[in-house]
């Protein structure tokens, strides 16, 4: 299986969870996300060589699109003909971050007969187009959380947003959470602190 994530951080989180549950199963997992330090060529080469050595012994690869494509193009004997499953985690973000061309090239390497799982928080035209590229139309099954509902947002859910200058963001979030300690709150932000 190959699991594609849009960022190194998300791939790392997925890998950490897989390691926790993996100890109860007989499969191996590998993380190929590229070097952390783009300024040190020697470290990048060492990371790449280490990844090359681990790929043949791995059942499940967790990777970023760019690094997977680099291995597909440069790692001798890296054969993906036996891949049975492709997981596109946060497919909308993969496309938003400019990996469309890389993704299309990756799909060209993979066997047509495979299971593809596409996870996306949004259903954009790009995500639907990606689904047509990567999924056999005869076997498409769309799972929507609110398919049968007239209204997607529950009536008792209160949604709001605040536009805050970046320098006040942390204080604003802290103040909001502190004043709503007894409430169930989810905060979505475009950037991390």
Segments the model singles out, each with a brief description of its role:
Residues 1-193:
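Conserved helicase RecA-like core
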């Amino acid at each position: 299986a190959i699991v594609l994530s849009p960022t190194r951080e998300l791939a790392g989180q997925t890998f950490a969870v897989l390691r926790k549950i993996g100890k109860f199963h007989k499969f191996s997992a590998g993380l190929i996300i590229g070097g952390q330090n783009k300024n040190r060529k020697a470290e990048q080469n060492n990371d790449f060589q280490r990844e090359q050595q681990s790929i043949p012994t791995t059942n499940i690869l967790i990777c970023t699109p760019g690094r997977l494509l680099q291995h597909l193009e440069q790692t001798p004997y890296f054969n993906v003909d036996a891949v049975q499953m492709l997981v596109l985690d946060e497919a909308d973000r993969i496309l938003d971050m400019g990996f469309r061309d890389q993704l299309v090239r990756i799909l060209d390497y993979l066997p047509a007969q495979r299971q593809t799982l596409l996870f996306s928080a949004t259903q954009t035209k790009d995500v639907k187009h990606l689904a047509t590229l990567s999924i056999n139309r005869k076997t498409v099954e769309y799972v929507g959380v609110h398919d049968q509902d007239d209204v997607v947002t529950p009536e008792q859910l209160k949604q709001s947003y605040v536009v805050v200058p970046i320098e006040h963001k942390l204080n604003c979030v802290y103040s909001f959470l502190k004043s709503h300690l007894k409430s169930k709150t989810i905060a979505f932000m475009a950037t991390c602190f």
